[in-house]
Amino acid sequence: MDLGEVARAIIDGNRYMVLGTADEGGRPWVSPVYYAPSGYSDLYWVSSPDAQHSRNLAARRELSIVVFDSQAPVGEGQGVYMSAVAEQLMDADLERGIEIFSHVSVSHGARPWTLEDVQEPASLRLYRARVSEHWVLDPERRPDQRTRVRP
C-alpha cells in the first residue's frame, strides 16, 4: 500500500481540516475550517483575524493540522497529520491565494471569492499553511503508528 497515495486521497477527498494552534503562553486551541489545497504543501482558508486560532497564529505561526473522514466506520479511521507554519496573506501572495481558494470553493459548489472578500473593510482574511511534514496511520503497524509520507 502506497501511504503517500493514502495521504493524497484524504486531502483531495475532504473539505475540512482541524487547525491546532497555541497562544503565546502555550495554551492549545483547535478549530475546524474549510480548506482549499494547492498541491499537498499549501493549504488555504478564510477566517476572521479576531478568531482565537487567528490570534494564536499572529503570536505563534507554528501549528498542527489533521484532515480526516469523520464518517469512517469505527476502527477504520485514517487521517493525514501535518506540521506547518501559517500566515495571513498580503500583496501578491493574497492575489494568488484567493484565486486558488475561489477555484476550489466553486468546484465544491460554493460561491467564488474575490480580493474584496478578504481585505478591509471585509471581516475575513485569507490564510495559508505551508506544510513541512505529513504522516498517516500505517495499517500494518496498529494501533496508532504514524508513518511520515511525501504525498
Task: Mark where each language-model region is.
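A short, aromatic/hydrophobic, helix- or strand-capping loop or linear motif
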Residues: 21-23, 67-73, 107-117
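Charged, gly/pro-rich active-site loop segments
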Residues: 77-151
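Short, surface-exposed beta-strand-loop junctions and turns on beta-sheet-rich folds
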Residues: 51-53, 72, 142-144
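Amphipathic alpha-helical interface surfaces
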Residues: 7, 53-56, 94-97
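Short beta-strand segments
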Residues: 15-49, 57, 63-69, 77-82
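Extreme N-terminal tail/first-helix region
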Residues: 1-17
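Alpha-helix boundary recognition
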Residues: 11-12, 58-59, 102, 119
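A generic "binding-loop/recognition-motif" signal
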Residues: 49-50, 132
